[in-house]
Swiss-Prot record:
Keywords: Lyase. NCBIfam families: PRK13290.1. It is an enzyme of class 4 (lyase). It comes from the Bacteria. Its EC number is 4.2.1.108. GO terms for biological process: ectoine biosynthetic process. The gene is ectC. This is L-ectoine synthase. Catalyzes the circularization of gamma-N-acetyl-alpha,gamma-diaminobutyric acid (ADABA) to ectoine (1,4,5,6-tetrahydro-2-methyl-4-pyrimidine carboxylic acid), which is an excellent osmoprotectant. It catalyses: (2S)-4-acetamido-2-aminobutanoate = L-ectoine + H2O. Pfam families: Ectoine_synth. The keyword Lyase applies.
């Protein structure tokens, strides 16, 4: 069994901040835990917009605090997100993620699992898993 504390992990290398300041993420479960997925708690900062296109990963996201929105670029549809909502990027959907005035905190599951140091590349993706 693995037990980790969010606040303790935020003081370690498991805490990752976006270079542009749009978000921070605490990676609680990673590829080296050998369970086939990763689990993160991510804070989307207020008033930000992040281009994301996970070409090599699937992601499920559950918002448990705050508000934001996801705009799918293929069709321009805007999906408001609030506490209690989830969305699943099951088609490698290219999208814009926006934090509203208070931002939002989300729980994210990735498959394949993240290694822990990923940051979004220029095209919005994470590098493929080796």
């Amino acid at each position: 069994m693995i037990v980790r504390n969010l606040e303790e992990c935020r003081k370690t290398e498991r805490f990752v901040e976006a270079e542009n300041g749009n978000w921070d993420s605490t990676r609680l479960v990673l590829a080296d835990d050998n369970v086939g997925f990763s689990f993160n708690i991510t804070r989307i900062h207020p008033g930000t917009e992040t281009h994301i296109h996970y070409k090599h990963h699937f992601e499920a996201v559950f918002c448990y605090e705050g508000e934001g929105e996801v705009e799918t670029l293929a069709d321009g549809k805007i999906h408001p997100i609030k506490a209690g909502d989830m969305y699943l990027l099951d088609q490698h959907d290219e999208h814009l993620l926006r934090g509203k005035e208070k931002g939002m905190t989300v729980a994210c599951v990735f498959n394949p699992a993240l290694t822990g140091r990923e940051v979004h590349r220029e095209d919005g993706s994470y590098a493929p898993v080796d």
